[in-house]
């Protein structure tokens, strides 16, 4: 079964509501964590059956934070350069480079 996702691994995105910049590091075809809490966005069955993304963002101190977000929570990021968050630019570039030129392992 092939599921189309709106975003790809290594792509920079923005959280629609909060505006945070992030980098997609993995994609699940549907919600795959433990049972969601009732007040969680994941309690919506329609959203649970759509793609979910593992996204690295930065906290207020510039430390990486792993988030798990529904496709509906994300928006395209038009710029690849963010002087205020260069580590996310570097992460996105590194992931894209690895996807284009994977290392062979014995």
Curated annotation (Swiss-Prot):
It is found in: Cytoplasm. Its main location: cytoplasm. Pfam families: YccV-like. The keyword Transmembrane helix does not apply. One of its GO terms (cellular component) is cytoplasm. One of its GO terms (biological process) is response to heat. InterPro entries: Hemimethylated_DNA-bd_dom, Hemimethylated_DNA-bd_sf, HspQ. Involved in the degradation of certain denaturated proteins, including DnaA, during heat shock stress. This is Heat shock protein HspQ. It comes from Photorhabdus laumondii subsp. laumondii (strain DSM 15139 / CIP 105565 / TT01).
